[in-house]
């Protein structure tokens, strides 16, 4: 059963993901981390792993926000059908 919380969370996620400031910050951060990873000394395994972990977490955050957005859309559709 869909909840209002899912609908609200989905809307908030969509607002965040579509926010130009958030998009710029996310892209800049990912670009910075990728650049740091590429520029790191091949022997500096710790630095390379830290960059890899940070990029992976950043991508997972984006994926999770997308999941919230999609779940909210589905919940909203369920509410709409229940009202008919």
Predicted regions and their residues:
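Charged low-complexity stretches with an acidic bias
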Residues: 55-84
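Residue-level signal for functionally critical sites in structured catalytic/ligand-binding pockets
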Residues: 15, 47, 72
């Amino acid at each position: 059963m869909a909840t209002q919380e899912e609908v609200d969370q989905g809307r908030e996620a969509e607002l965040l993901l579509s926010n130009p400031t958030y998009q710029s910050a996310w892209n800049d951060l990912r670009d910075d981390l990728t650049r740091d990873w590429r520029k790191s000394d091949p022997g500096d395994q710790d630095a390379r792993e830290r960059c890899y972990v940070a990029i992976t977490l950043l991508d997972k955050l984006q994926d999770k926000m997308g999941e919230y957005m999609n779940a909210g859309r589905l919940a909203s559709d369920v509410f709409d059908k229940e009202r008919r």
